[in-house]
Amino acid sequence: MLSPTHIGKFGGPSMPPEWLLKGFSASIAGSSAQAPRPLHQRGDRSKLRIANFVGLSGPSGIWGPASINSSLLAASEINRRGGILGREIEIAFHDTGGDLDDVTQTASDLVASEGADIITGSHISAVRVALRKVVAGHIPYLYTPVYEGGERTPGVMAIGETPGTQWRPAIEWLTNSKRAQRWYLIGSDYVWPWLSHKAIKKYIKDAGGHVLGEEFVPIGEHDHSRQLARIRAAKPDVVLITLIGADSIVFNRAFAEQGLGSRMLRLAGAMDETVLLGIGADNTDGLYCASGYFIDMATRANDIFRDQYQASFGRHAPPPGSIGQSNYEGLRFLETVASRAGSLAIKPLLSAAANVEYQGARGRIDIRRGNARMPIYLAAANGLDFRLIKQF
């Protein structure tokens, strides 16, 4: 039986909007979250109470169900091994897709009331930047997905892909293999695309290419006609995309529907099988993605993870792509670091986390000076799946 859970005041995982699933019959149900129940107080040392802040609504809400499932699976496995430092994991999920002030107030209330021992999450970086202001120095905070790098806030641990490992080799490969020289950048208007683009422009220049244009689009924007007109006029070899979640789906659909898919390549970052499903098989020609995880990775660690995921949530559960699956990685990382530190206090935990090796569905991951080192894969969209073509 999976670990006890609680859905925070923002509610449980919602279905995506009807337009997102138009033409598809695959279910995104499959979360095994139980009915809400009060969590134990922090004074109960037999329980380790984790508050997982995850997108359950808004553009990042498409990853919510798989994020919940991946968290529950990791917690169940760890609890069967005796928990973390002998403490059974309990998870409370809180939505980050709504008003940012409400999200930070929830975190602040948890800290003030001793309502959680640890905060984790696979939310967007804008949420991380806000949460660390109220969490840092009080309880440990573990951030799991791809991000812009450079997180050094005391008490905050980040284990996702960063621009140097994710983007640089993919840009070099497209330059050498596809003769890509002319690039156009488009991303959501928040910190991950801002800082990632700064690094990406250097990588493109180093590879001998040049950037024709750059755009940042408000989160939740559904009309990309002006951006697409400018892209069409610029005639780039590659459009590099850092749009988030459902926003990426809308853009990529419109991109293909306007016939641009046959004229230029696309390279995306926060792209996984969930997003690919939303884009649709007919709209993915020339679409590449660089990531530390794909569902079809042919490794023993991933085979075990996929088998356990399907056994726990069923064949039609939401696919655990890179964003959702990072929640599984996070708890596996926490288990290793806590065991090494012998404590869940911030100082020893952070000391142990700075240089450590752990095993997850991605295989062996090395953390050195707080930065995750992992194999990065370049994949090409093939209908509703990704075909892995290169490991860096």
Where are these regions (language model features)?
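Extracytoplasmic ligand/sensor domains, especially the bilobed periplasmic-binding protein
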Residues: A116-L212, R263-A268, T274-A281
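Hydrophobic alpha-helical
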Residues: S125-A130, P236-Q258, A381
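Short, well-structured alpha-helical segments in soluble
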Residues: F93, G97-D117, W173, H222-K235
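Extracytoplasmic "Venus flytrap"
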Residues: P38-K47, A51-L72, H94, L100, ...
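Hinge/beta->alpha junction and helix N-cap segments in small-molecule ligand-binding domains
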Residues: A92-L100, P145-G149, G160-W167, G187-S196, ...
